[in-house]
Amino acid sequence: MYVSNGKDTCQLLGPVSLFVQTLMGMTAVIVLLVKRNYEHPRRKMIVWSYDIGKQIIGSLGIHFLNLGISILKKRRRSLFAITAKGNDDEDQCDWYFLNLLLDTTVGIPILWLCLYIIEKVLKSLHFQNIESGNYFPSKTVGSHPRKPLFSAFVKQLLIFIVGLGVMKFCVFLILNYLEDLAYWFADLILGWSDSWPNFQVFLVMFVFPILLNCFQYFCVDNVIRLHSESLTITNAENFETNTFLNDEIPDLSEVSNEVPNKDNNISSYGSII
């Protein structure tokens, strides 16, 4: 990608890129709101907020991690340059784009596998309230009204962050061992925009992220949300009652104050699509 001795390079922390990143985040939230309106059954707003909160917090962490890796990678390559001309003039945008591409494609099945294994292990250790997408208590205490537990959200968020961390490590290894091929691929896709660095930032930080993130959010949301196939009377409270289809209404004869033990060793994570 284009690099000169001046300032016309792709800078991920420049004013244009920071503005575009903010706009990207706002657009992603709007897309997720639209997706919720077409759900059957539809999650309650507080439950949806918890599900999306896990993705947003995790995505912010991965986003800034990608920025940091991209910038440090560029500085390290510049520090160890051998010749005056250097063969390490790849922009920060190269590495960021490649991280983004793998995070939102190859990273999704890796994340699903990580979450599946983590939850299965924790359930075998009898951890409570870790069923993904179910934030209501597994037991009813007295006559107190049942409401989503923030502690359940925190537990599931920590599981999600650990899964993201493992996924990010796998993606980093893939890029690190296939670095030359990765940079060639980035230059093939982005090289034509070298003469317009601000436009290149717009592509890398907005256009591609919007397209890739929409795909990623859709897939990951399907993984972490509570699926209608797993509905029981104890977890149906996560959904708005007037949005159930006829074949999704849980059997009221299954009323119980405790989640059946048969689910203790079964992961609640759904399919990617």
From Swiss-Prot:
Topology versus the membrane: Multi-pass membrane protein
Q: What is this protein called?
A: Vacuolar membrane protein YPL162C
Q: Does the keyword Amino-acid biosynthesis apply?
A: no
Which keywords does the record carry? Membrane, Transmembrane, Transmembrane helix, Vacuole
- List the top taxonomic levels of the source: Eukaryota, Fungi, Dikarya, Ascomycota, Saccharomycotina
Native source species: Saccharomyces cerevisiae (strain ATCC 204508 / S288c) (Baker's yeast)
Where is this chain's protein located in or outside the cell? Vacuole membrane
Q: Which cysteines are joined by disulfide bonds?
A: none
List the Pfam families hit by this protein, alphabetically.
Answer: STIMATE (PF12400)
Cytoplasmic side, ranges: 35-51, 119-156, 220-273
Q: What is its main location?
A: membrane
Q: What else does UniProt say about it?
A: Present with 1440 molecules/cell in log phase SD medium.
**Cellular component aspect of the GO annotation:** fungal-type vacuole membrane; membrane
* Residues in the Vacuolar compartment per record: 1-13, 73-97, 178-198
Membrane spanning segments where?
14-34, 52-72, 98-118, 157-177, 199-219
